[in-house]
């Protein structure tokens, strides 16, 4: 059978179809886990259900050497680069781990690090004392926040832009493992290729502008902070006060997802979660192509990320 290099449109349609099936598996896992394990356990495991569903889906297809349902839909076949050979088992296993498990593990480790940093009893982090050094504590928190909200999303956007321009490696995991797609169809949609390439360049320009704005905002904020510190020193006779350790957590509140008592935030329905958990849940839900809103993990009320209200005086 003759095979051809898969085009961008075919790969995108295949991935969208796979994402639809993964969403369906996630919904089924959610219903089953809620009925069997109870609501409290379900709430705690809800953020991980999509990664579990993705791991199960790709293990039963890619690892076993089968086509995914999306690949069957558009007649695509996985290949070791453009050599027209089946990817090796280690490559397929590595793809599943990088694509499904690595984001979950990295996000979990970052959350645990942030939880450790925000706890007032933590003496040191990575060998650096932070118990009485609130500046170092806040610097670590800023770094992890930047990794989670800036670096990882920007890298994903840059990779998608490169995919639109070159037509190779839809996901970062496929780029690392060298797995590409071959197609059984010989047709070529030149106008669509031009549109995708245009979108790629627009995305890169948007990314560059976003990075420039972020850098400018950071420099302006640093300038403002330095000015504020100088004014405080003048007003306080040269003394510099440390932040109150207890300002980092709230002993009367506990997030029902991560069970931490930090940064309480409320939804319209009245349920409380920590800012990190509910924002990540909302962003993950709204980033899916199948839905435009998230749902409260407890009562399933629809909401947008902008509807989350931080409670600063709890």
UniProtKB/Swiss-Prot annotation:
Top-level taxon in the UniProt lineage: Eukaryota
Localization in the cell: Peroxisome membrane
ZnF locations on chain (RING-type): 255-300
Binding positions for Zn(2+) 2 per the UniProt entry: 269, 271, 296, 299
Keyword terms, alphabetized: Membrane, Metal-binding, Peroxisome, Peroxisome biogenesis, Protein transport, Transferase, Transmembrane, Transmembrane helix, Transport, Ubl conjugation pathway, Zinc, Zinc-finger
GO biological process, one term: protein ubiquitination
InterPro entries referenced in this protein's UniProt entry, alphabetically: PEX2/10, Pex_N, Znf-RING_euk, Znf_RING, Znf_RING/FYVE/PHD, Znf_RING_CS
Pathway(s) where this gene product acts: Protein modification; protein ubiquitination
Top enzyme category: transferase
Primary localisation category: membrane
Reaction catalysis annotation: S-ubiquitinyl-[E2 ubiquitin-conjugating enzyme]-L-cysteine + [acceptor protein]-L-lysine = [E2 ubiquitin-conjugating enzyme]-L-cysteine + N(6)-ubiquitinyl-[acceptor protein]-L-lysine
KW Manganese (keyword) present: no
Spans through the membrane: 8-37, 39-60, 91-110, 143-166, 198-218
Pfam families on file: Pex2_Pex12, zf-RING_UBOX
Membrane topology: Multi-pass membrane protein
One of the record's GO cellular component terms: peroxisomal membrane
Activity modulation comment: The E3 ubiquitin-protein ligase activity is stimulated by PEX12/prx-12.
Peroxisomal matrix side: 1-7, 61-90, 167-197
GO MF assignments: transferase activity; tryptophan-tRNA ligase activity; zinc ion binding
SUPFAM superfamilies assigned: RING/U-box
Family: Belongs to the pex2/pex10/pex12 family.
Note: Complex locus in which transcription results in the production of one large primary transcript that gives rise to two functionally distinct proteins, wars-2 and prx-10.
PANTHER family named in the record: PEROXISOME ASSEMBLY PROTEIN 10 (PTHR23350), PEROXISOME BIOGENESIS FACTOR 10 (PTHR23350:SF0)
Quaternary organization: Component of the PEX2-PEX10-PEX12 retrotranslocation channel.
UniProt note: domains: The three subunits of the retrotranslocation channel (PEX2/prx-2, PEX10/prx-10 and PEX12/prx-12) coassemble in the membrane into a channel with an open 10 Angstrom pore. The RING-type zinc-fingers that catalyze PEX5/prx-5 receptor ubiquitination are positioned above the pore on the cytosolic side of the complex.
Name the UniProt record assigns to this protein: Peroxisome biogenesis factor 10
Organism: Caenorhabditis elegans
């Amino acid at each position: 059978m003759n095979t051809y290099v898969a085009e961008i449109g075919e790969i995108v349609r295949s991935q969208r179809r796979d994402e639809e099936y993964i969403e369906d598996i996630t919904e089924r896992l959610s219903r089953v886990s809620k009925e069997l394990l109870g609501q409290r356990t379900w709430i705690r495991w809800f953020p991980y259900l999509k990664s579990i569903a993705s791991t199960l889906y790709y293990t039963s297809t890619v690892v076993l050497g089968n086509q995914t349902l999306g690949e069957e839909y558009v007649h695509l076949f996985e290949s070791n680069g453009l050599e027209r050979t089946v990817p090796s088992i280690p490559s397929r296993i590595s793809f599943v781990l990088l694509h499904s498990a690595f984001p979950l593990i990295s996000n979990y480790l970052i959350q645990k690090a942030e939880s450790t940093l925000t706890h007032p009893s933590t003496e040191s982090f990575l060998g650096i004392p932070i118990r009485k050094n609130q500046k170092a504590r806040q610097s670590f928190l800023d770094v992890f926040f930047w990794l989670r909200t800036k670096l990882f999303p920007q890298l994903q956007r840059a990779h998608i832009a490169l995919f639109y321009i070159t037509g190779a490696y839809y996901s970062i995991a496929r780029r690392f493992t060298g797995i590409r797609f071959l197609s059984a169809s010989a047709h070529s949609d030149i106008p669509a290729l031009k549109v995708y390439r245009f979108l790629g360049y627009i995305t890169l320009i948007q990314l560059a502008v976003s990075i420039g704005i972020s850098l400018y905002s950071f420099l302006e904020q640093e300038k403002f902070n330095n000015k504020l510190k100088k004014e405080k020193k003048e007003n306080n006779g040269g003394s510099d006060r440390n932040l109150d350790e207890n300002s980092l957590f709230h002993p009367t509140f506990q997030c029902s997802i991560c069970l931490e008592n930090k940064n309480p935030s409320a939804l319209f329905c009245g349920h409380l979660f920590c800012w990190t958990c509910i924002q990540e849940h909302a962003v993950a839900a709204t980033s899916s192509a199948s839905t435009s809103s998230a749902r409260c993990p407890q009562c399933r009320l629809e909401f947008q990320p902008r509807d989350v209200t931080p409670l600063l005086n709890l």
